[in-house]
Amino acid sequence: MIEFRNVSKVYPNGTKGLNNINLKIQKGEFVIMVGLSGAGKSTLLKSVNRLHEITEGEIMIECESITAAKGKDLRRMRRDIGMIFQSFNLVKRSTVLKNVLAGRVGYHSTLRTTLGLFPKEDVELAFQALKRVNILEKAYARADELSGGQQQRVSIARALAQEAKIILADEPVASLDPLTTKQVLDDLKKINEDFGITTIVNLHSIALARQYATRIIGLHAGEIVFDGLVEAATDEKFAEIYGDVAQKSELLEVAAK
């Protein structure tokens, strides 16, 4: 379980990114967070593995505080958290296989991983992960030779090879076309269902949130304004999440597509 206890985040310029967040996400859930740009979705997501440090409160993972973790303990906890970024976050000039093997870095010494000395068991894990997302034939291609959708599937394979217990996906389909968007979200959903990996995804699309989520969390101005099952996420609730009544009809048109 991931638990946020009275979590707040204030940026150096005084902007409040998160305001007293209290939230529990159970093991194996597939949660989608929605809201306007700047609502706090990315800040909340990235605070889980401390890419963003919180100002107040505490974040617990399986009853252990990642907020208080240091050194080896922090590295161990981060090893269980796979991150998928909008920009893919791949080493473009490296092969797909090497990018997937980056998911194994947390299991070995810095010297060993710098030299690329991964054991054959790790290489086999990487191949299995690539096969899982239907991109095994690209193992020895350079990452920058791949389409955007293929690169994002490499990111998913990296998280699988990492043997992550939690996957955090920050706007993973923002730059992808509709067909590729479906492929990437289908992959994430299937992995969640087959392996029980707790998955949190940030999205802008109301329609996609309704299609894929089992639970939707809506953020507005750094606060949770909705938290419930898909069935409870009515058009009116989405209008509240997005906060502008004048845009309500536009939002509902998007949701209907």
Swiss-Prot record:
GO cellular component: plasma membrane
Entry keyword annotation includes Translocase: yes
PROSITE patterns reported in the protein's UniProt record: ABC_TRANSPORTER_1, ABC_TRANSPORTER_2, PHNC
Enzyme class: translocase
Keywords for the protein's UniProt record, in alphabetical order: ATP-binding, Cell membrane, Membrane, Nucleotide-binding, Phosphonate transport, Translocase, Transport
Location(s) in or outside the cell: Cell membrane
Function noted in UniProt: Part of the ABC transporter complex PhnCDE involved in phosphonates import. Responsible for energy coupling to the transport system.
PANTHER family registered for this protein in UniProt: AMINO ACID IMPORT ATP-BINDING PROTEIN (PTHR43166), PHOSPHONATES IMPORT ATP-BINDING PROTEIN PHNC (PTHR43166:SF6)
Subunit structure, interactors included: The complex is composed of two ATP-binding proteins (PhnC), two transmembrane proteins (PhnE) and a solute-binding protein (PhnD).
Family from the record: Belongs to the ABC transporter superfamily. Phosphonates importer (TC 3.A.1.9.1) family.
Protein name: Phosphonates import ATP-binding protein PhnC
Organism phylogeny: Bacteria, Bacillati, Bacillota, Bacilli, Bacillales
This protein's encoding gene: phnC
